[in-house]
Amino acid sequence: MSRRGTAEEKTAKSDPIYRNRLVNMLVNRILKHGKKALAYQIIYRAMKKIQQKTETNPLSVLRQAIRGVTPDIAVKARRVGGSTHQVPIEIGSTQGKALAIRWLLAASRKRPGRDMAFKLSSELVDAAKGSGDAIRKKEETHKMAEANRAFAHFR
C-alpha cells in the first residue's frame, strides 16, 4: 500500500480576458513550441472575428460549438482472443470537451487559408450552426459506436 497521499485534482485555470476555462483549454491545445503569447493572440483574434461575423457574444458561440462537437460515446480498440474489436465506451464531460477542442482545431488547420485566427473563427461559427468538419467527425464517431454496439459487453 502506498504511503503517499492521494494527489489533489488540479483546478483548470482561466484566461486573463474572458476568465473562462474553455478558452484556456483551447489556448493550451493550440500552443506550439511553448509560444503561449502567440496562442492567446490567435484565440483573441478569432474571438474578435466571431464577434464581427455573428454580432453575438463570442463566448456563447464557443460554448455552443464545443457543446455541438462533444461526443457522448466513442470506440476503443480492445484485443479479445486474437482479434481486435472496436468497443464503444461512454465518455466523461472533461474528456469529451478535450476531444471536441482537438477536433475543432484539427478541422481549423485543414481549412484553406493562411490566417489561423480566421480559420478557427470560421470553424467555430460553423460548428455552432451544426455544420463543419468537426461536427462530421463527431457524427462519424457516433456511427462507429452504433455499428459496433454488439461488442459493448467487452468493456
UniProtKB/Swiss-Prot annotation:
Pfam families: Ribosomal_S7. GO terms for molecular function: rRNA binding; structural constituent of ribosome. GO terms for biological process: translation. Keywords: Plastid, Ribonucleoprotein, Ribosomal protein, RNA-binding, rRNA-binding. GO terms for cellular component: plastid; small ribosomal subunit. Its main location: plastid. InterPro entries: Ribosomal_uS7 (IPR000235), Ribosomal_uS7_bac/org-type (IPR005717), Ribosomal_uS7_CS (IPR020606), Ribosomal_uS7_dom (IPR023798), Ribosomal_uS7_dom_sf (IPR036823). It is found in: Plastid. Belongs to the universal ribosomal protein uS7 family. One of the primary rRNA binding proteins, it binds directly to 16S rRNA where it nucleates assembly of the head domain of the 30S subunit. Part of the 30S ribosomal subunit. This is Small ribosomal subunit protein uS7c. It comes from Lathraea clandestina (Purple toothwort).
